Amino acid sequence: IDGCVDIANEVGTAKIGDPYDLFIHNNEEKALYAVESWYSWHSREDYRNNIYSIRNAYYGTRTGAISELSLSKAVAAVNANLDTEVKKAIDDAAAAIWAIPSPFRNNINSPEAVSAMEACATLEGVLKGSLKSCIEGIDKTVLAEVVKNYVDVVVLPTYSDLKAGNQALF
């Protein structure tokens, strides 16, 4: 789950937060260049997709459906309220990012950008706090099945798609 914690932190504090901090300190040009994907106008999509990667890891699928062999199901079996909290934090972060007016490069200091940073911080806190300690108490054989499912259903197909997409470029 540490990778998911890192992603939530990076989206909130670096990808949105760094340009925001530069902008509010009157470094507007540097703020613009600090925006990831500013030239393609797809920053919000990239940031939301980062949050979706957390969702994919937690749900054990790439579709938004929850696998029976997911971390979500394993957590729900021991703490249904925590599972609901994690899912809400993921959904809230993705929605807050999408609520930033498009393009992000023209709305760096918007109230919605601040809300997105806060939602990412909340997600990070839930992941590295309650969720991490809950996972430590889940049976290792259950977690092994969750990891196997994640690798087989999320990781390997993702890399296969990336490889195919890369080959299509040439």
What are these regions (language model features)?
Residues I1-F170:
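Mature extracytoplasmic or organellar-lumen-exposed domains after removal of signal/transit peptides
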